[in-house]
């Protein structure tokens, strides 16, 4: 199978980039699919997550939208960026001729309905839709996508118009390590202090863990 992953900026050091690299490597190494990762934005930074040598990484070199306080100019800049990204993406997709195209992040949601291909178009939601400031623009993607993949069942409920919605949690490739010494009663959690990270739930869960150890 010929698989394409579309991501905003593969040079970013984030969770989406990490999971895309893991999936791409797994599809290629374990299932022997042909895999291409397409990075939309122009970014000269070194990529943080290594792809197998057999996986193609294509940069479309689309410049970022201009940052300005002028709302009209900002909107026009974003529209131009989107149209340029759609043009270059369609040109690249035509050359690759994939069987399935996975779209990620906000830009991916906007590009999916603009991508003209016979391949299956699947949107991977890596963020709860309600937390995305541009979620109101997801309607067209929702109707055009052959499927939407979410991380949780609660996330899946937010895509009522989609033809098919699947829940596939992110996998972890870090070996399980058992704690041998429970004498240390201190624990740390690292992450952005935002509602979507669920630190409130983590604190609640830790109460039960503390009782056991």
Where are these regions (language model features)?
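Conserved donor-binding/catalytic core segment of Leloir-type glycosyltransferases
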Residues: 4-6, 180-197, 203-207
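N-terminal strand-loop element at the rim of the active site
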Residues: 5-13, 26-76
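A short, basic/aromatic alpha-helical/loop segment that forms part
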Residues: 13, 174, 194-199, 212
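A structural motif in glycosyltransferase catalytic domains
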Residues: 20-23, 27, 187, 202-205
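A conserved nucleotide-sugar
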Residues: 32-34, 199, 203-213
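Short His-centered aromatic/hydrophobic patch
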Residues: 82-85, 103-109
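A conserved, positively charged/aromatic
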Residues: 93, 121-146
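Carbohydrate-associated surface elements
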Residues: 154, 171
């Amino acid at each position: 199978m010929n698989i394409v992953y579309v991501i905003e900026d593969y040079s970013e050091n984030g969770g989406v980039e990490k999971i895309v690299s893991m999936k791409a490597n797994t599809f290629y190494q374990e299932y022997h699919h042909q895999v291409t990762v397409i990075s939309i934005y122009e970014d000269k930074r070194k990529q943080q997550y290594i792809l197998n040598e057999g996986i193609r990484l294509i940069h479309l070199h689309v410049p970022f939208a201009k940052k300005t306080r002028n709302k009209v100019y900002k909107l026009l800049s974003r529209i131009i960026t989107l149209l340029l990204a759609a043009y270059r993406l369609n040109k690249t997709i035509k050359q690759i001729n994939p069987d399935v195209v996975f779209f990620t992040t906000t830009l991916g949601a906007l590009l999916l309905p603009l991508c003209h291909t016979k391949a299956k178009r699947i949107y991977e939601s890596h963020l709860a839709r309600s937390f995305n400031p541009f979620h109101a623009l997801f309607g067209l993607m929702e109707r055009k996508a052959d499927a939407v993949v979410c991380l949780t069942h609660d996330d899946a409920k937010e895509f009522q118009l989609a033809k098919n919605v699947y829940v596939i949690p992110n996998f972890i490739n870090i070996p399980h390590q058992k704690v041998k010494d429970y004498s240390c009663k201190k624990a740390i959690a690292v992450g952005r202090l935002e509602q979507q990270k669920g630190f409130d739930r983590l604190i609640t869960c830790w109460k039960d863990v503390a009782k056991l150890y």
